[in-house]
Regions:
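A gly/Pro-rich, aromatic-decorated transmembrane alpha-helix motif that marks the paired
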Residues: 1-10, 156, 216-232
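Intracellular loop-helix junctions on the cytosolic face of multi-pass helical membrane proteins
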Residues: 4-108, 116-137, 150, 159-160, ...
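Transmembrane alpha-helical cores of Major Facilitator Superfamily
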Residues: 108, 112, 146, 178, ...
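Structural signature of the two symmetry-related core transmembrane helices
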Residues: 136-154
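Hydrophobic core of transmembrane alpha-helices in multi-pass small-molecule transporters
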Residues: 157-158, 164-186
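Intracellular juxtamembrane helix-capping segments at the cytosolic ends
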Residues: 185-199
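Loop-to-transmembrane helix entry/capping segments in MFS-fold secondary transporters
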Residues: 201-210
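Low-complexity, acidic interaction segments enriched in glycine
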Residues: 248-442
Length: 495
């Protein structure tokens, strides 16, 4: 967890994923070498099926499945530490304890905290809690679910600060990791032990499989929610742009619900001879009217690598006018570039008031982070959060002499070198900007169509916090009315 992000940053994916592959091969070899030292339980045959489908076996699966449904929500939140929390860390101050952390490296705290906190729980926290209430496995799990809600609620608060234009320290994520690791100890470790003890002798492996199914279910729920909140857009067309064949004059094709026409400005055989920023292909998308060469068309331009170089929409002019007003407010907000602020939502709305899109509807403004904001129009269909929304994403690139001086002696990482190699001078400017070496502070803008999310920012985190809290409350009656009995591995009364 600590080494892989560092290897990826400095040596590239070949080494970053090759090293874990070699280590896994060594681990597999060690496992194989000890094959004669393990206990081998012979297949149970029909006795296994009889116990699984017996009244006791079916009731055990049913009772534990109710427990696992609530725990699945725990996993839906916990496994987002490797996705949503990494994205959150990108907008935080990553210099902590004198170290420049990579966003994905903060995950290393979890296994370290697990090793530190297990003895703490075993010898201090559990004995103290036992003086107040009798701690059963189900009560530990229930407490852990509420603690998980608190941990994710903390991350929601942090995201709220980010949405408000601040750049909090990544130390706040450390605190959140402490909380959710405590929840993991009470839910995951206790849940595994409880599941094993509740499973009849021949069903230990089956119950472990059902336990792992709850992990899978939690991740599936996360995937479904993230798919559900995603608004379609032109990304599906952009991803396939280089693979599409040119369409004959007056003929269109369909891709991801878009009617489109593909035209090569340069024969494909000559693409490699063109400059990196030269437009070699154009794709025209028809708007809601379903016709081409009308006011609601969208024109996409691509370079020889299939990279998107330009987007022309009916709302480019009002969006540019709105961006000009927001940018002006940013530059006059402070003398020091590091202190300049993107306007808050209310102030931004006031600045763009009166600017309307091609259909006469107002342009919407939203501050995303300290350095990013978004301008949106409803597009030709007049409906928000649809695939026709025209979106201008703006990013402030700050000149930061102090940061540039601090990183002056730091060599270029593999990722930075690769970025320069792939994008040329544009990539070099991106690397210099990230190091604070931009000649002057500027605000870059990029236009796209669709692709918004109906749930984002702090609202996204609060949604999952609410789900976890609801699951924790639902678990209380399950724990109260749960009736099961432990089955020991060497229980002579169990067939």
């Amino acid at each position: 967890t600590l080494l892989t992000p560092w290897l990826l940053e400095w040596y590239g994916p070949h080494v970053a994923f090759g090293v874990p592959g070699v280590l896994m091969a060594i681990a597999t070899l060690m496992f194989w070498l000890g094959r004669n030292e393990y206990i081998h339980v012979p297949p149970g045959g029909l006795a296994f099926l009889r116990e699984v489908f017996s009244r006791d076996g079916l009731l055990t699966i049913l009772r534990l499945s109710l427990v696992y449904l609530c725990i699945a929500v725990f996993w839906a939140l916990f496994d987002q530490t490797s996705s949503a929390w990494v994205l959150q860390a990108e907008d935080m101050n990553l210099r902590w304890l004198g170290i420049d952390w990579l966003p994905s490296q903060i995950q290393v705290l979890n296994p370290i905290l697990v090793m530190v906190m297990i003895p703490l729980f075993q010898f201090l926290i559990y004995p103290l809690l036992s003086r107040v209430v009798r701690l059963t496995p189900l009560r530990k799990i229930g407490i852990g679910l509420f603690v998980m809600a608190a941990g994710f609620g903390l991350s929601a608060m942090v995201q709220g600060w980010i949405d408000g234009g601040t750049r909090p320290s990544v130390a706040w994520q450390f605190l959140a990791y402490v909380v959710i690791t405590a929840a993991e100890i009470m839910v995951s470790i206790t849940g595994l032990e409880f599941s094993y003890s509740q499973a009849p002798k021949t069903m230990k492996s089956v119950i472990m499989a059902v336990w792992l199914l709850s992990v899978s279910l939690g991740n599936y729920v996360t995937a479904v929610v993230n798919h559900w909140i995603q608004v379609p857009g032109i990304n599906a067309v952009v991803a396939r742009a280089a693979d599409l064949e040119p369409t004959p004059e007056g003929i269109e094709t369909t891709l991801a619900d878009w009617e489109l026409r593909v035209a090569d400005l340069v024969p494909r055989a000559d693409w490699r001879t063109q400059q990196d920023d030269a437009t070699v292909r154009e794709i025209r998308l028809s708007g809601p009217d379903g016709r081409f060469a009308t006011a609601d068309d969208i024109l996409l331009s691509f370079n020889r690598f299939g990279g998107l170089t330009g987007v022309v929409t009916p709302d480019d002019e009002p969006l540019a006018a709105a961006k000009e007003k927001i940018d002006a407010a940013f530059f006059v907000s402070a003398d020091n570039d590091a202190a300049k602020e993107i306007p808050a939502d209310e102030a931004g709305d006031a600045l763009v008031a009166g600017i309307v899109d091609s259909s006469g509807r107002p342009v919407r403004y939203q501050r995303i982070t300290r350095d990013r904001y978004r301008l949106t129009t409803d597009g030709p269909d007049g409906q928000p959060f649809t695939g026709d929304d025209v979106v201008l994403q703006a990013t402030a690139v700050r000149a930061d002499p102090e940061e540039a001086a601090r990183l002056a002696d730091k060599p270029l990482s593999w990722r930075e070198k690769r970025l320069i190699e792939l994008k040329g001078e544009e990539g070099r400017r991106e690397v210099e900007a990230a190091r604070g070496e931009a000649p002057k502070t500027r605000i870059d803008g990029a236009t796209t169509v669709g692709g918004l999310a109906t749930l984002e920012g702090a609202d996204y985190y609060w949604f999952w916090t609410g789900c976890m809290l609801a699951a924790a409350v639902a678990f209380v009656p399950i724990a109260v009315f749960y009736r099961g009995r432990p089955h020991l591995q060497d229980d002579p009364t169990v067939a």
